[in-house]
C-alpha cells in the first residue's frame, strides 16, 4: 500500500509540473521584444523604437485615439499641455484594461500643423511614460483632428498578459 501511495504522489507531482510549465512559458512569452537594428539610425533619442515583436498567440488590445481633454472635456489651447494630458489619458486607458506602458507595442500620434519645434515636447512626454522601453511609433502630421481645438492625439496597440 505505501508503494501505491508513493506512485500516486509521484504521478500527481509529474502532472502538476507538466501543467505548470506551459503557464511559465506563456507568462514569459507575453513580453514584447524591442528591436533597433544597428544598421539603421538609432531612433531612441527621438522617443521611439524601430520595431516591436509581439509573441505568437498574444492577446492584443487597441486603444482609440486619446486627445488632450481633461476629465471635464476641456482642452487647453497649449500644445504641450494637450500632449501631457493625452499621455495621462492613455495611462488611464491602459489602467482601464489592466495593462502597463511596457505592454504597448505601437503608438500612432497625430499632430496638427506639425513642425520640428514640436519634437522636443513629443519626445519628452513619450520618454516620461515609457522610459527606455520605447514602443514603435509613427507620427502623422494632419491639418486638423476631430474637434477644432485638438492639436494632438495618440492611439496605442497593446499586448495583454
Report the location of each language-model feature:
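N-terminal presequence-like segments and the immediate start of the first folded domain
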Residues: 12-88, 92-105, 112-161
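Bacterial N-terminal signal peptides that target proteins for export
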Residues: 2-13
Amino acid at each position: 500500500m505505501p508503494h501505491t501511495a508513493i506512485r500516486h504522489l509521484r504521478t500527481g507531482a509529474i502532472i502538476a509540473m507538466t501543467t505548470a510549465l506551459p503557464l511559465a512559458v506563456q507568462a514569459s512569452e507575453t513580453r514584447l521584444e524591442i528591436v533597433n537594428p544597428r544598421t539603421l539610425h538609432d531612433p531612441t533619442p527621438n522617443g521611439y523604437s524601430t520595431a516591436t515583436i509581439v509573441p505568437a498567440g498574444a492577446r492584443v488590445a487597441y486603444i482609440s485615439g486619446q486627445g488632450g481633454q481633461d476629465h471635464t472635456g476641456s482642452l487647453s489651447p497649449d500644445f504641450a499641455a494637450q500632449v501631457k494630458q493625452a499621455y495621462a489619458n492613455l495611462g488611464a486607458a491602459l489602467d482601464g484594461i489592466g495593462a502597463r506602458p511596457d505592454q504597448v507595442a505601437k503608438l500612432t500620434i497625430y499632430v496638427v500643423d506639425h513642425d520640428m519645434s514640436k519634437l522636443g515636447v513629443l519626445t519628452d512626454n513619450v520618454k516620461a511614460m515609457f522610459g527606455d522601453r520605447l514602443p514603435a511609433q509613427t507620427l502623422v502630421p494632419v491639418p486638423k483632428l476631430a474637434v477644432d481645438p485638438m492639436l494632438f492625439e495618440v492611439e496605442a496597440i497593446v499586448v495583454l498578459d
